[in-house]
């Protein structure tokens, strides 16, 4: 299912403990780490897709989590050109996502990465709330930053401002929200500092 602009509907999952740490997993046979995410089926709502992906990728059931909130509307990112399959009938140039924040209420024994015959992840750990922004694959950093900025106030209400904190300045400097008709994030060069210059403002979209 790809929209007219070439973006595939998708859901992303931020699974958080009471202390503000989030679930971070390594992809099978790859060095990359990321949040659970996956494409939506044509007959699914975003919430239905989220619970299905949660079960497939982590083994967790709805009773093991509490849905705290979600990003409003779609957040988009483009795939790198090398990952775009131009010979397909419908060309997918990226993902448009709804991101969900879940509180983990179960036991770690409920986490089963091999729940399906084709697992997505082979290892997991808990990390600080903002850690993924700087450590996910480069082309996803913009959308991770936007998603976590939307969800941070909800996370702070649960874990407390000290546990979640603010997005690190180095992450904001490395990735600034891009602007385009498609609404995706684009990497920008780090601005040079000038004496007496005012700090660059970041739009909270």
UniProtKB/Swiss-Prot annotation:
TM segment ranges = none
Which parts of the sequence belong to the Nudix hydrolase domain? 6-149
Q: Does the keyword Hydrolase apply?
A: yes
Q: Where is this motif: Nudix box?
A: 38-59
- What NCBIfam families does the record tag this protein with? PRK00714.1-4 (NF001937), PRK00714.1-5 (NF001938)
Q: Please provide the record's keywords in A-Z order.
A: Hydrolase
Question: Gene3D superfamilies, from UniProt?
Answer: Nucleoside Triphosphate Pyrophosphohydrolase (3.90.79.10)
Q: What is its EC number?
A: 3.6.1.-
Q: What is this protein called?
A: RNA pyrophosphohydrolase
Q: Name one Pfam family in it.
A: NUDIX
The task this protein performs is described as: Accelerates the degradation of transcripts by removing pyrophosphate from the 5'-end of triphosphorylated RNA, leading to a more labile monophosphorylated state that can stimulate subsequent ribonuclease cleavage.
Known PANTHER family for this protein?
ADP-RIBOSE PYROPHOSPHATASE, DIHYDRONEOPTERIN TRIPHOSPHATE DIPHOSPHATASE
List cofactor names only. Answer: a divalent metal cation
What InterPro entries has UniProt attached to this entry?
A: NUDIX_hydrolase-like_dom_sf (IPR015797), NUDIX_hydrolase_CS (IPR020084), NUDIX_hydrolase_dom (IPR000086), RppH (IPR022927)
The protein's matches in CDD domains, at most eight in alphabetical order, are given as:
NUDIX_Ap4A_hydrolase_plant_like
Q: Which family does it belong to?
A: Belongs to the Nudix hydrolase family. RppH subfamily.
* An example molecular function term from Gene Ontology annotations: pyrophosphatase activity
- State the residue spans of region: Disordered: 177-205
Compositional bias of type Basic residues: which residue ranges?
187-196
């Amino acid at each position: 299912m790809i929209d007219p602009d070439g973006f595939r509907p998708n859901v992303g999952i931020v699974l958080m403990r009471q202390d503000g740490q989030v679930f971070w997993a390594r992809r099978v046979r790859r060095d990359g780490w990321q949040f659970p995410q996956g494409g939506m089926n044509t007959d699914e709502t975003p919430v239905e897709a989220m619970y299905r992906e949660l079960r497939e990728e982590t083994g967790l059931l709805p009773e093991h989590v509490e849905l705290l909130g979600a990003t409003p509307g779609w957040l988009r990112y483009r795939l790198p050109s090398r990952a775009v399959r131009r010979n397909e009938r419908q060309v997918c140039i990226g993902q448009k996502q709804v991101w969900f924040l879940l509180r983990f209420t179960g036991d770690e024994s409920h986490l089963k990465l091999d729940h399906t015959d084709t697992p997505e992840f082979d290892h997991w750990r808990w990390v600080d709330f903002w850690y993924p922004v700087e450590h996910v694959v480069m082309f996803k950093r913009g959308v991770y930053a936007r998603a976590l900025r939307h969800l941070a106030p909800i996370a702070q209400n649960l874990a407390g401002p000290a546990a979640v904190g603010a997005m690190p300045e180095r992450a904001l400097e490395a990735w600034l929200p891009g602007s385009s008709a498609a609404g995706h994030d684009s990497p920008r060069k780090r601005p040079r500092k000038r004496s007496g210059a005012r700090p660059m403002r970041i739009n909270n979209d």
